Design a protein with these regions (language model features):
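Interfacial aromatic-anchored transmembrane helix boundaries in multi-pass membrane proteins
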Residues: 37-42, 49, 84-112
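Membrane topogenic helices and adjacent juxtamembrane segments
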Residues: 7-41, 150-176, 197, 201-202
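Cytoplasmic juxtamembrane interface segments
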Residues: 101-131
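Transmembrane alpha-helical segments of multi-pass membrane transport proteins and ion-pumping complexes
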Residues: 26-37, 57, 61-65, 89, ...
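Membrane-embedded alpha-helical hairpins and interfacial helices in multi-pass inner-membrane proteins
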Residues: 49, 126-198
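Central hydrophobic cores of alpha-helical transmembrane segments
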Residues: 76-85, 122-133
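Cationic, low-complexity basic patches in intrinsically disordered or flexible, solvent-exposed regions
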Residues: 4
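Hydrophobic transmembrane alpha-helices
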Residues: 15-79
């Protein structure tokens, strides 16, 4: 009886710790997205989010890999993706801009789970998928430009601003967008795995 109570207590403590770690990771990843937006603005000053997902993945890989190390359970990455989705939904980027956060978070979690969250290759593939969780605004711009423009107008943006940030869905632009995210996510994942291992070794 005492052993059962003790086991339940330990599980509850571990669950609370996992929840707090996941929430902290979500906050840190939001900061990484903010840095990604800033770096993207330095590269392209038109004001759109074209390079933000790539730079967010570059600086956010360490947070992602550390979360996999600390909470190797299904649900942590899905929760991270859910927070991304809520952010885009709350910031009124347009109907559908939140969907990549949900889809990529769930898919990335499933991929990492295939390797029990310890397989470096599967964890890397997982992050390559998750990196597209912040691509909602650009994808919506290409898939449904009318809805995207309407969302911007509803947020008080001028037509001049909208005309300036719109990116035509041309093949070279699409390839640049996808390849930049994949490349930066790969670098972010490798650096993140190295740093998370270093941190884990010291703990």
């Amino acid at each position: 009886m005492i052993q059962l109570v003790l086991l339940v207590y330990i599980k509850e403590k571990l669950m609370k710790k996992n929840i707090l770690t996941t929430l902290l990771a979500a906050v840190l990843y939001f900061l990484c997205v903010g840095i990604g937006v800033f770096l993207g603005h330095l590269v392209d000053q038109t004001g759109n989010m074209f390079y933000a997902p790539a730079f967010s993945a570059l600086v956010g890989g360490s947070v992602y890999m550390l979360l996999l190390t600390k909470v190797p359970r299904f649900g942590a990455i899905t929760t991270l993706g859910l927070f991304m989705a809520i952010f885009f939904l709350a910031s009124k980027h347009g109907a559908g801009a939140f969907l990549p956060g949900l889809a990529c978070g769930l898919a990335a979690d499933a991929i990492a789970r295939l390797g029990n969250y310890r397989d470096r290759i599967k964890n890397t593939l997982s992050f390559l998928v998750f990196a597209f969780s912040t691509s909602g605004p650009i994808l919506l711009m290409w898939i449904n430009p009318a809805s995207y423009e309407a969302a911007l107008l509803a947020r008080g943006k001028s037509q001049e601003y909208i005309d300036r940030i719109m990116v035509a869905p041309e093949l070279d632009k699409i390839l640049l967008f996808v390849s930049s995210i994949l490349l930066c996510a790969l670098i972010g994942a490798v650096v993140g795995q190295f740093l998370s291992q270093k941190i884990a070794d010291k703990l």
